[in-house]
Amino acid sequence: MNRPYNFSAGPAAMPQEVLTEAAAEMLDWHGSGMSVMEMSHRGREFVSIYEQAHLDLRELLAVPDSFKILFMQGGGLAENAIVPLNLSARVSPAGAAGSADFVVTGGWSLKSQQEARKYCTVNIAASNESDGHTTLPGPASWQLSHGASYVHICSNETIHGVEYHTLPDLQALGSEAALVVDCSSHVASRPIDWSRVGLAFAGAQKNLGPAGLTLVVVREDLLGHALAVCPSAFNYKTVADNQSMFNTPPTYAIYIAGLVFQWLKRQGGIAAMEARNQAKAALLYDAIDNSQLYYNKVAPNCRSRMNVPFFLRDESLNDAFLAGAREHGLLQLKGHKSVGGMRASIYNAMPMEGVQALVNYLHEFQKRRS
């Protein structure tokens, strides 16, 4: 079966091997007589699925033993509240809410600081809003505050298509705050330098699996500082102490994510995926930059390898472009409503053949309209 190529920003395309495997196991997982979605989360069958997914993810992302891996719910948007509920009091007296620094580089980090203001004092350490979120403020320019509990960045902005290709070293900047990284839209697309990270979180629905699962990787010394008002199910220490089963976890989403982890291992792991992703992004950006019809607004040194926004110089052609793309089996290319234009999300599951098909269509559409 030749499926269309899905460029959705999330929920996003899944590896076809994973979908085929899940379909085969839908009614009877490994002779258990049950679908995974019917299993008790405390039964031995699902516990084995959870434990394998946990082990595979730690191996794939090279997560040190000093970090806890949590499988939670609520997505990245919920983590914008859960993080300050857990970390803002870390360096404050008597468990009072403290402060946090935010680097605002696009729509998602903007939402993050807006949500955090409900629970702690927020300092905007840097922002690229004045240039339309098309560049990234270098860490040396950040105005970090003294005594902040953490510094929050979105390392890849899904909407605006900017990416920090290297995580900042807060210690080198003279800050003792923990670095919090929203890596929802490029987790598992490249290695992570955990020596620079205090906490990383990611909604699974872009690069790890289906919607419903949220990954949190948190350094152990950051546990146990939650505000008194933090709900028990969102208290990282409570979740960690109960192996992510304090409340019923998103069992089927964990199962599918586990299949994705195994697929990633078969592809050669994260380093292999990074090389593949760099090649895909280079192919697409080259086609856009060397065209007469399309353009990308983001500075080349901070372009996202996962989310590629682009625009037609003649916007009256937008509808025709999208209709033609669908006819060519290229789906979900419409840009975010706040930005307009087009966007191609080329996550791990997008094969090089899919990007090449898009590039071929870009050339064909331009030729017909010239």
Curated annotation (Swiss-Prot):
EC numbers, comma separated: 2.6.1.52
Cofactor binding note of this UniProt entry: Binds 1 pyridoxal phosphate per subunit.
Residues holding L-glutamate: 42
Subunit structure comment from the entry: Homodimer.
Listed cofactors: pyridoxal 5'-phosphate
Identification of the protein by name: Phosphoserine aminotransferase
Binding site for pyridoxal 5'-phosphate: 108, 158, 182, 205, 247-248
Catalytic activity: O-phospho-L-serine + 2-oxoglutarate = 3-phosphooxypyruvate + L-glutamate; 4-(phosphooxy)-L-threonine + 2-oxoglutarate = (R)-3-hydroxy-2-oxo-4-phosphooxybutanoate + L-glutamate
Cellular localisation: Cytoplasm
Modified residues (N6-(pyridoxal phosphate)lysine): 206
Entry keywords, A to Z: Amino-acid biosynthesis, Aminotransferase, Cytoplasm, Pyridoxal phosphate, Pyridoxine biosynthesis, Serine biosynthesis, Transferase
MF GO annotations: O-phospho-L-serine:2-oxoglutarate aminotransferase activity; pyridoxal phosphate binding
Role summary: Catalyzes the reversible conversion of 3-phosphohydroxypyruvate to phosphoserine and of 3-hydroxy-2-oxo-4-phosphonooxybutanoate to phosphohydroxythreonine.
Record pathway: Amino-acid biosynthesis; L-serine biosynthesis; L-serine from 3-phospho-D-glycerate: step 2/3; Cofactor biosynthesis; pyridoxine 5'-phosphate biosynthesis; pyridoxine 5'-phosphate from D-erythrose 4-phosphate: step 3/5
One GO CC term, this protein: cytoplasm
Any Pfam family hit: Aminotran_5
